[in-house]
Amino acid sequence: KEAKVDVTVYDHGVGQATKAAAGIISPWFSKRRNKAWYRLARLGADFYQELVEDLAKDGINTDFYQQTGVYLLKNNEEKLEELYQLALSRRKESPLIGDLAILTKEEVAQQFPGLQGFEKLLYASGGAHVEGALLTETLLKASGARVIREEVALTVTDTGYQIAGENYDQVILATGAWLGQILEPLGYQVDVRPQKGQLRDYQLDLDTDDYPVVMPEGELDIIPFQQGKISMGATHENEMGFDLMVDQALLNQMETEALTYYPELAQAEVIGERVGTRAYTSDFSPFWGALPDRAGLYVASGLGSSGLTTGPLIGWHLAQLVVGGNLRLDPADYPVEQYVKK
């Protein structure tokens, strides 16, 4: 926006993982050994503070981001101490973590009445949640970009690129699990596969505005939003391709598990389900940057289930590459050529 770049966004929107997501921003407890990934996730969490501040300065509503803290539950509660120490050691470079504490049932009951299924849990006040659909809508509106909501293809021309009959000097392909469908016709092999994710939304007659996110072990998360809305999910289905059908049986199974932690959900009204398609690479690492043999073509994919944590920061970096700005991360740590090959 500041660099006076003329931007057009093509967004088909069908199956988009971000829109279907209730994202948890809390990367500090991850035990992934991939240092480049952790740096991206840590700075991605920090970046929300900047993003929210910038939007607020422009008078734009930032309700998509709520910092209400997170609860981490472990089947073996001895592991909580280990995770507490890990987060404590990371707090120096990530003060956003905020207050860290191992809480008892009694202490939790004051913050999140009715939560059960544990003796102790780990709490970090800096954890946040993001409403994916609202985030995408807010960013598109704030960007002032022209938005064309249709499925398009990319053609290489002598002078640059063509999309839907219009010519462009530079193109960013942030097309998630669909990256291969755009690049394969141009002769590339793309190491990105789809993963289906589903979640269910509930409405409770309760004030849930300040409830922390609940993260038990496994796939289940319970994510309270404002005014009694609670999301539960999400599934991680690797064999379903780009399927977008709601699987009630699978969500009912997850709900049964959720009820062991939060029986109150039995009183809630189900207000909808969401389905989206995440993008994964074969080694679960994201990649972003310029396509080595094509000037002016930039890509990003493979963000997986941490996409709401890392996505905005990757988007900022791609914009910096387009306008020749300074970067905070080294693109060599997220090498495009490892996943997109001729």
Region locations from a protein language model:
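Core beta-strand elements of the Rossmann-like FAD/NAD(P) dinucleotide-binding domain
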Residues: 162-170
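Dinucleotide-binding Rossmann-like beta1-alpha1 core, especially the glycine-rich loop
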Residues: 24-107, 111, 257-259
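Conserved beta-strand positions in the Rossmann-like core of class I SAM-dependent methyltransferases
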Residues: 8
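A conserved short coil-to-beta-strand element within the FAD-binding core of flavoproteins
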Residues: 128, 146-162
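Helix-loop-beta segment of a Rossmann-like dinucleotide-binding subdomain
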Residues: 61-74, 89-140, 235-240, 295, ...
